[in-house]
Amino acid sequence: MLFRSSLATQSEFNIGYDPCSNYITIPIIDEIGSLVGIKGRYLGNPDESHLKYFYLEKCNKSRVLYGYWQNKEHIKNNPYLIVVESEKSVLKLAEYGYRNAVATGGKTISKYQVELITRTGCTPIFAFDKDVSKEELDDIASMFIDSMKVCAVIDNDNLLDEKESPMDREDVWNALYQNCMITLK
């Protein structure tokens, strides 16, 4: 199931449902609080005529860090910023009590997103899915200014399945966050 988060979290992030398309709706809010797009996640197993993820209202995802607006006060008061791939992971982390998280919308990151992360003043901790290699994370780290520390959570203990997100199970996330963090630069 996509969202096993509480109604309060879904309400705070304005998660909805479009019965016409059978998509869960995820409003994409930029860093100043403006609605810039709506992402949909097909409810159930999509057939050939439906995409699993689809922008119902298109936006430039490379100019947004999902969750920043909702978590901004927590981010300001934390030395670390957890950077994940998906919107779902931001919601899961909120459920686990981690309100210092944002999503890039995929395993790539834009220069603009790097600038947004840098402006927070936090040390970024990349917690991408298991299928993202350390080399890919090193490439991302190299996009940041030389003096900025960049960390990552890497599953060297093989706690995750191949396509699993570190946030899919709370006990696994806590173990990874506490025991599997490395400094990339």
Predicted regions and their residues:
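Phosphate-interacting basic helix/loop segments used at nucleotide- and nucleic-acid interfaces
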Residues: 8-10
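Short amphipathic beta-strand and strand-loop transition segments with alternating hydrophobic
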Residues: 13-17
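Phosphate-handling DNA/RNA-contact segment within nucleic-acid enzymes
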Residues: 18-120
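TOPRIM fold recognition
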Residues: 36, 90-91, 95-185
